[in-house]
């Protein structure tokens, strides 16, 4: 497992929030953004990835379990799903914050219609790792989101 957060199929102890989200998704009553807050290791990223997989799989189920062998899971795990983007600090290039160029790429991402016809989804990991310029650039799209866009962002 390269990234346990992306690949986990278990989300223990959070049945209420998952049931709430599942009902919202299945009733097609999603908000455009969800802020997840809590201590590190609580499951914020796991929840965001589970929701993303379920929404992009575009199948109604009784739970949000999407098997890791399904196409949508493989595309998300390999960061190659055309309707999904993650903003996070670039550790490989020793960046300590989410850069403005990443936010610009995200805005451009949302300027195109979804490839598979459903939602375009962005996970922002983590909002408190953005500089002021990145935050301000992101604010515009959060205030006036394109149709069928969805953001999950979390803070510690």
Language-model segments: what does each one mean?
Residues 125-127, 153-156:
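A short beta-strand-to-loop transition that corresponds to the Sensor-1 phosphate-sensing loop
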Residues 1-133:
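Clamp-loader machinery-focused feature within the broader ASCE/P-loop NTPase space
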Residues 111, 136-153:
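Conserved catalytic/switch belt of AAA+ P-loop NTPases
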């Amino acid at each position: 497992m390269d990234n346990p957060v992306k690949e986990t199929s278990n989300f223990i102890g959070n049945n209420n929030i998952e049931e709430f989200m599942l009902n919202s998704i299945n009733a097609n009553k999603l908000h455009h953004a969800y802020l997840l807050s809590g201590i590190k290791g609580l499951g914020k990223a796991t929840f965001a990835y589970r929701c993303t997989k379920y929404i992009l799989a575009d199948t109604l189920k009784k739970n949000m379990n999407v098997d890791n062998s399904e196409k949508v899971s493989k595309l998300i795990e390999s960061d190659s799903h055309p309707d999904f983007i993650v903003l996070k600090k670039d550790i490989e290039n020793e960046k300590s914050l989410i850069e403005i160029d990443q936010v610009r790429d995200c805005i451009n991402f949302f300027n195109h219609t979804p490839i598979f016809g459903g939602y375009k989804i962005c996970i922002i990991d983590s909002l408190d790792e953005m500089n002021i310029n990145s935050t301000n650039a992101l604010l515009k799209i959060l205030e006036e989101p394109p149709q069928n866009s969805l953001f999950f962002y979390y803070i510690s």
